[in-house]
């Protein structure tokens, strides 16, 4: 266990968190690291590209079939994927029933008790980040994940979620050893995206670990249920993920305690960058449009 790096990828739904994490981990395994992935997202897609398969059976669904978690063996839930990466999905309940975070808690305890954490260099948690409720905060709260990487973009909701996740990290940073490893910007090609990502990282007392450019090759690889590292190892995008993996690898012990900002400060930042408009600007634009329309109608 000495030297075990427990990292987690958080980010809002649909941000490309699972894609980014799996490509990063595929690049890390190429560097000779032994890896265990624990998927903590109810979608159970945190290991799909590593296993080249549809979503794997989750600990919760297998436990329900077997009777209880105690009735499971480690080999029932742990699958081996690309270059020996160990994969587990914790799963979640039926929509509208129970707490999705409960599966995370149940899974991590089961894995630890059954020796899944032995003989690995990295344990990576892939966690839904829109809701920092008790269950999803579990890897942070229980002092499991030590380094949190927030996957975000220049879109307002992604920035909002990143700031919220930073609040969750701050809450547990003093009682446990959890730190913010940094932000990973998954390019959405919004205005001034790199500047905004770097500015937010600075405000959060952190760093932008890497800016991942947008490339359709990611979708081509996903359709084949593969990471870009496996599908197109010589591509420019694979090189980007390798750079990201190298930066994560060299970032051990360099995490910080975040300084989240208020909603007002976040909105002010978006205004300063011209991403968001004031009500006056919006009204002026609307008035200009109406005037142009009226002028066109006259002619």
Curated annotation (Swiss-Prot):
Binding-site list for ATP: 11-18
InterPro entries per the UniProt record, alphabetical: NifH/chlL_CS, NifH/frxC, Nitrogenase_Fe_NifH, P-loop_NTPase
Post-translational modification: The reversible ADP-ribosylation of Arg-102 inactivates the nitrogenase reductase and regulates nitrogenase activity.
Annotated binding of [4Fe-4S] cluster, by residue: 99, 133
Keyword Nucleotide-binding set for record: yes
Modified residues (ADP-ribosylarginine): 102
Keywords per UniProt: 4Fe-4S, ADP-ribosylation, ATP-binding, Iron, Iron-sulfur, Metal-binding, Nitrogen fixation, Nucleotide-binding, Oxidoreductase
Cofactor info, note text: Binds 1 [4Fe-4S] cluster per dimer.
Cofactor field: [4Fe-4S] cluster
Superkingdom of source: Bacteria
Molecular functions per Gene Ontology: 4 iron, 4 sulfur cluster binding; ATP binding; metal ion binding; nitrogenase activity
Catalysis performed (reactions): N2 + 8 reduced [2Fe-2S]-[ferredoxin] + 16 ATP + 16 H2O = H2 + 8 oxidized [2Fe-2S]-[ferredoxin] + 2 NH4(+) + 16 ADP + 16 phosphate + 6 H(+)
EC number: 1.18.6.1
GO terms under biological process: nitrogen fixation
Subunit structure: Homodimer.
Free-text function comment from the UniProt entry: The key enzymatic reactions in nitrogen fixation are catalyzed by the nitrogenase complex, which has 2 components: the iron protein and the molybdenum-iron protein.
Protein family according to the UniProt entry: Belongs to the NifH/BchL/ChlL family.
Name of the molecule in the record: Nitrogenase iron protein
The gene coding this protein: nifH
